[in-house]
């Protein structure tokens, strides 16, 4: 039996990110919080330079990190610095917080595929950084759109969106 693995992704308001990611095959659990910044014990009211992020626990026998990243790049715009939809500021930046060298390699390779694909109109600005502390958000932010299905989101699945791999990928 393979142990569950973890991913930490930031792509704008964590409500919409969590709601879509939690439904993906192989995802065991998600929680929203703050990561990639400078404040200990971050909260919604005081999270300094942290991004709103989603911690994902997944079964590597049912999905893989690359598949999660491809979905991540489908549901948010990785070309807008510090912005998703109407949300602006460093809290809403696009970021991948990797937990090991293999996650870093896969993240950089996936970004290169996104760049080469032309699926997004600009240059990818997604930050790729080592994972630091993940500060879990307050209970009212956890699974927000499950409790309030008509609540705010700027994330959506783009029908027909498929990320091709570059011919040189993995070489």
Curated annotation (Swiss-Prot):
Keywords: Oxidoreductase. It comes from Mycobacterium ulcerans (strain Agy99). It is an enzyme of class 1 (oxidoreductase). This is Peptide methionine sulfoxide reductase MsrA. Belongs to the MsrA Met sulfoxide reductase family. Gene3D superfamilies: Peptide methionine sulphoxide reductase MsrA. PANTHER family: PEPTIDE METHIONINE SULFOXIDE REDUCTASE, PEPTIDE METHIONINE SULFOXIDE REDUCTASE MSRA 2. GO terms for molecular function: L-methionine:thioredoxin-disulfide S-oxidoreductase activity; peptide-methionine (S)-S-oxide reductase activity. The active site is at residue 13. Pfam families: PMSR. Has an important function as a repair enzyme for proteins that have been inactivated by oxidation. Catalyzes the reversible oxidation-reduction of methionine sulfoxide in proteins to methionine. The gene is msrA. Its EC number is 1.8.4.11. One of its GO terms (biological process) is protein modification process. Disulfide bonds: none annotated. It catalyses: L-methionyl-[protein] + [thioredoxin]-disulfide + H2O = L-methionyl-(S)-S-oxide-[protein] + [thioredoxin]-dithiol; [thioredoxin]-disulfide + L-methionine + H2O = L-methionine (S)-S-oxide + [thioredoxin]-dithiol.
């Amino acid at each position: 039996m393979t142990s569950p693995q973890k991913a930490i992704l930031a792509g704008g308001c964590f409500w919409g990110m969590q709601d879509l990611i939690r439904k993906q095959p192989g995802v065991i659990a998600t929680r929203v919080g703050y990561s990639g910044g400078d404040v200990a014990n971050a909260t919604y009211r005081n999270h300094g330079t942290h991004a709103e992020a989603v911690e994902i626990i997944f079964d590597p026998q049912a999905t893989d990190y690359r598949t999660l990243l491809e979905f991540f790049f489908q549901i948010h715009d990785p070309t807008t610095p510090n912005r998703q939809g109407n949300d602006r500021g460093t809290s809403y930046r696009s970021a991948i917080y990797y937990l090991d060298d293999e996650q870093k390699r896969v993240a950089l390779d996936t970004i290169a595929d996104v760049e080469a694909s032309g699926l997004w109109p600009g240059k990818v600005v997604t930050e790729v950084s080592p994972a630091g502390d993940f500060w879990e958000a307050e209970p009212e932010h956890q699974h927000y759109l499950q409790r309030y299905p008509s609540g705010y989101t700027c994330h959506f699945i783009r029908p027909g969106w498929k990320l091709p791999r570059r011919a040189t990928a993995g070489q």
